[in-house]
Amino acid sequence: MTRVRSSKLVLDASAVVRMMEESPQAAEFRELVITAEVVLAPELMLTEVANALWRLQRAGQLELEGLHQRLSKASDLVDHIEPDRHLQVEALALACHLDYPVHDCLYLALARREAAMLLTADQRLEKLATLVLP
C-alpha cells in the first residue's frame, strides 16, 4: 500500500513492534517516522508496546536483557504523548460508531483531532482510518 507523507503522524503500537522485529514493513515505517515533522501517540501506545515486548520475551523471541532499552527506544520515536483521558470521549464515540474497541479508537481519535496520518500495521484499523480521517 502506498502511504502519503504527512507533517503529523500518529504512531500505533503495532507499527512500533514491526519496526523492532525488523518486519518487511520496518524500513517504510521508519522512513515515515523520520520524515514526519511531529510524531504523536496516545499514552496507551507505550503500554501496548511493553505488553508486546513481554509476549515476545515469553515466547523466547527476545532476551530479557534489553527489553527496557527497547521500550525506551519506542518512547524516543514519539515527540508528544497525548494523555488517554483527553481522547476517551471521542474514542468512545468512534468505537460505538465503528463497532471497534475503544483502546484502538484512541489512535483514530488522536489522528482525527490532529489531522494526522495514522501509521499502523493493523490492516483493519488502517481500513477504519480511511472512513474517519480526512
What are these regions (language model features)?
Residues 48-52, 70-73, 90:
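A general alpha-helix detector
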Residues 3, 76-119:
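Active-site neighborhoods of divalent-metal-dependent phosphate/nucleic-acid chemistry enzymes
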Residues 15-16, 45-46, 87, 107, ...:
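Alpha-helix capping/helix-boundary segments
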Residues 51-58, 112-113:
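Short glycine/serine- and small hydrophobic-enriched flexible loop segments
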Residues 28, 48, 90, 127-128:
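Phosphate- and divalent-cation-binding pockets in alpha/beta enzyme and binding domains
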Residues 12, 104, 122:
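Acidic active-site catalytic centers that drive phospho-/nucleotidyl reactions
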Residues 1-44, 56-69:
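Short, well-structured N-terminal submotif of metal-dependent ribonuclease cores
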Residues 1-8, 108-134:
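Acidic, PIN/NYN-like endoribonuclease modules and their adjacent C-terminal/linker elements
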